[in-house]
């Protein structure tokens, strides 16, 4: 059964690579209202970039969210590209809002059940990503969403979202 939270609360997932002392990812996942909107389910992935040794600057790091066929796929469809804010938050939905809702933007919209695979990569080709004092990450963050149709309501729901990195 899907997790049901009180209005305004959203589940958050965090992981940290303690070996390299780099916070790998933080995701917040939710549908904008929990109600069907023309049988579309929206999911809002986020990551957090941490920088050791000094304060992170807004726009200092660039990231790409790519939909792929599976985790071994290195090419795929670019869903969104954006940079971090002054707190390190990387908010793909603000860069490519497909929900039409400005208060609850989302960059992923699903119109049919299925399992969907994504990769998040740090894009060091962007301008400003050449600070010689910073060791840029080549880590790939992967995540999967599982979209199912609720038999009782017919509504599409994200029943599972999991992630990893390598």
Role assignments for model-derived ranges:
Residues 1-166:
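Solvent-exposed loop/turn and edge beta-strand elements of beta-rich ligand-binding domains
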